[in-house]
Structure formats: C-alpha cells, structure tokens
Regions:
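Conserved cytochrome P450 K-helix E-x-x-R motif and the immediately C-terminal K′/meander segment
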Residues: 75-100, 276, 377-415
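Cytochrome P450
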Residues: 30-34, 46-47, 225, 314-325, ...
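Acidic-aromatic/histidine active-site loop/patch
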Residues: 164
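C-terminal helix/juxtamembrane-tail motif
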Residues: 1-9, 407, 412-414
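Compositionally biased low-complexity segments, especially N-terminal hydrophobic helices
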Residues: 1, 11-16, 291, 296-299, ...
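N-terminal membrane-proximal hinge/A-helix region immediately C-terminal to the signal-anchor transmembrane segment
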Residues: 3-145, 153-155, 159, 181-189, ...
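Cytochrome P450 heme-thiolate monooxygenase catalytic core
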Residues: 133-144, 152, 156, 175-344, ...
Length: 415
C-alpha cells in the first residue's frame, strides 16, 4: 500500500509539474504574440499614433505583400514618373495617406514605427542618436550579409572602421578605374554583337548585365589579386540572396530557420561552402603576407589595396587585429551591401538617360572630349567628367531620392 501511495503521489506530482510548465509556456507565448502587441498598440494610440491593426502572429505582413504585389503588377503611372515610392514601398505610400507621416506597422509580432516628418527624423538621427541602435536584421538576412562593419558596435566597430577606411580613399578607388573600364567595354561589345545578330537592334535587361559588372568590381575590391577564387565564393553567395529576399517578405517564426526543410538545407550547404572557401582564401593570403614580410616585401609598391590585404596586414606582423572569422564576415558584408545598391543605381541612371536623350548627348560629348574616341577612362580622367558624375548624382533634378533608415530603440533607454 505504501508503495502504491508513493507511486500515485509521484504520478500526480509529475502531472502537476507538466501542466504547470505547459501553462507557463502558454502564458509566455500568448504574451509575446497577443497581449504585448495589444499593449503596444494601446500605448501608441494614447499618443495619437495609429496604424493598420495587428493580426495574430502575422501582423500586417499579408496586407504588405498584397499591396506590393498589386503595385508590381502594373506599370508606374504616368510612365515617365520619377516618383518611385508608390512602387518600391507601396504599403508605406498607402498607409501614410491614411494614418499620416507617423504610424505603426507590424512584421509579425514585431512593431515598427515609421517616421517621415523631417524634424522628428532629425531628432532621432542627431539629437537623440544615443537612444537608438542599429536595426537588427532578419536572421536569414543577417546570415547572408554577415556580421560586418554595418552591424558592429563600440570598440570593435571603431577597429574595423580604422582598418577598412584606407580601401575607400579616392586614390585607392581610382586604381580600380582601368578594371571597371575593361569590364564595361566587354559588356558593350557583347551588346553590339547581340544587336548585330538581331538586325541592328536588341532589347536587354540592363539590371542583369549591370549585376555582373558590379559583382566583378566588388570582388576585385575585396580580394585584389585573388579575384578568381573570390569570384567563385561570391557566386555562391549570390545564390543565397534569393533565399534572403524571400525570407525578408515572410513573418519571422522563431526557430523556423533550424527546421531541415529543403530550402533550409540548401541554404546551410551554400553557407558552409562559402565559409570554407573564404577561410581557405584568407589562409592562403595570410601565408603570402607572412612570406612577403619575412622577405621585406610587405609594401605593395603603391598598388591597389584590397579589403582582404588591409585586414590581414592590420596588426603589422603581430597577433592579428581582426580574427579570420571577422574577416569572413566583412567580406560577406561588403559583397551584400555593394552589389545590389550599385546595380540599382546604374539601372536607374540608365533609365533616366533613356528618358532624357539630351543628357545622353551631353555626357557622350564630354566622354569623347576628355577620353578620346577609343581610350578607356583612367583615374586622371575621372575628375574631369563632371556631367557624367552629375547624371548619377541624387542632386540631379531628374533623380527621385528617398531615404530609408531603420533603427531600434536602445534597451537601456526603455527600461
């Protein structure tokens, strides 16, 4: 009898413990997915800040996707409009007309306060900048873009910035001009061949072609003389961009990226290959740098300084100032941050030149006058190409310029 009573007590104790744990988990989940979003909605509503209503788990994502799909399904109106905002951020354009310049939207259970009033934006970015941190990206996007300079903080950010800044000095970037010129010349020759084969005229998607030019330039800026090896690695990272783009449009379900789905397994495999390739490349370049220093040939003779060589040589022969893992992340960040933005700039500038042929003529005449009929632009030519620089500048009257900046509130400020 005593054994049966003890067994019964133990069974009831385990049952009570299990139910209590389940109840606690349920309360935590309910608070994260329902009560907390509702409290935040009420908090902002009392301050006069409203927005589309929060829906359990998905937030406003369904409405966002629907608005973006609708905007992408039809051409911009009018066709020669430079107002790209209704197309690029259709949900923001739509809700701003309803809720005003400041409103609340939901990416799943995560709120985002959108602000477009210039004075309030200035206060956030300048006057009270210490109260805000950098925005923490979607985990899949963060895996792709790397934990590099754009997401670092404090002393580590200062170290990386100091080491990498020389790569962006004008004198150093000018040394890339011949490589970029040859890439663009090869691109135009292929277009000429395609046009000749099609009877003198052909339609091309310039965005796809410009991606190749941007990728080649960024790879050379990152890896320098190890261009061929770096290109293989960055091509794999380009494949990962499709997964990140898709994930960014979905609700972030905690832990979902750890499930062995088909796309997750492919993403993991690509990430492993990228890391393995970068580690091998960094190791080879580190050995070359050590041998060069041993032979007193550490100076590059005034040549181009790529990002990888700057990070490897940062410690001046002592213990590495930037570990290999951080070098890997910086390489990923630079490729992710530079490729798409450069492609978009070139594509939009080309569209604007097509819409305004008079600027084409002015830029073409300037290039011929400065560089000649057959000579590629060099670093000596670049400062003289004023009209060409102006056509790709946000200050150009035909450029539509929109600022999109994301920040998160510092936790210490909210406590």
């Amino acid at each position: 009898m005593m054994e049966e009573a003890a067994s019964s007590v133990a069974w009831w104790w385990w049952l009570w413990t299990w139910r209590s744990a389940a109840a606690c988990v349920l309360v935590v989940v309910a608070d994260a997915l329902w009560w907390r979003p509702r409290r935040l909605e009420a908090h902002f509503a009392r301050q006069g800040v409203r927005g589309p209503p929060y829906r359990f788990l998905v937030g406003c994502v369904r409405e966002m996707v629907a608005l973006m799909a609708e905007a992408a399904s039809k051409p911009m109106s009018p066709p020669d409009s430079h107002n790209a905002l209704p197309r690029v951020l259709a949900f923001y354009h739509y809700w701003r007309k309803i809720y005003g310049p400041t409103f609340l939207i939901w990416f799943g259970p995560t709120p985002r306060l959108t602000v477009s009033d210039p004075e309030l934006v200035r206060e956030i970015l300048v006057t009270r900048a210490d109260a805000f941190d950098r925005y923490e990206a979607h985990p899949v996007v963060r895996q792709l873009e790397g934990d590099g300079l754009v997401s670092l903080h404090g002393d580590k950010w200062a170290l990386h910035r100091r080491v990498l800044t020389p790569a962006f000095y004008p004198d150093n970037l000018n040394r890339l001009a011949p490589h970029v010129g040859r890439s663009v010349a090869a691109l135009t020759e292929r277009w000429r061949a395609m046009a000749s084969a099609a009877g003198g005229e052909v339609e091309v998607d310039v965005a796809e072609w410009f991606q190749a030019v941007a990728e080649e330039t960024i790879t050379r800026a990152t890896f320098g003389r190890s261009y061929d090896s770096g290109r293989v690695v960055f091509r794999m990272q380009g494949r990962l961009m499709a997964f990140a783009s898709e994930a960014f449009r979905k609700v972030l379900v905690p832990g979902y990226r750890f499930f062995p789905t088909k796309k997750n397994r492919l993403s993991w495999s690509l990430d492993r290959e990228i890391r393995r390739g970068l580690v091998t490349l960094i190791g080879r370049r580190s050995d070359e740098a050590a041998e060069a220093q041993h032979d007193n040939k550490g100076n590059n003779g005034g040549g181009f300084r790529d990002l990888l060589s700057l990070m490897i040589n940062a410690a001046g022969g002592k213990k590495q100032a930037i570990p290999v893992a951080d070098m890997l992340e910086e390489c990923k960040t630079f490729f992710f941050a530079g490729k798409q933005t450069t492609t978009n700039l070139l594509t939009w500038a080309t569209v604007l030149l097509a819409m305004h042929p008079e600027w084409q003529d002015r830029a073409r005449r300037e290039v011929v006058d400065v560089c000649g009929d057959d000579e590629l632009p060099s670093k000596e030519h670049l400062p003289k190409l004023k009209t060409v620089q102006y056509t790709a500048s946000p200050s150009h009257p035909h450029f539509s310029f929109h600022l999109h900046h994301q920040s998160s509130i510092n936790k210490q400020t909210t406590e």
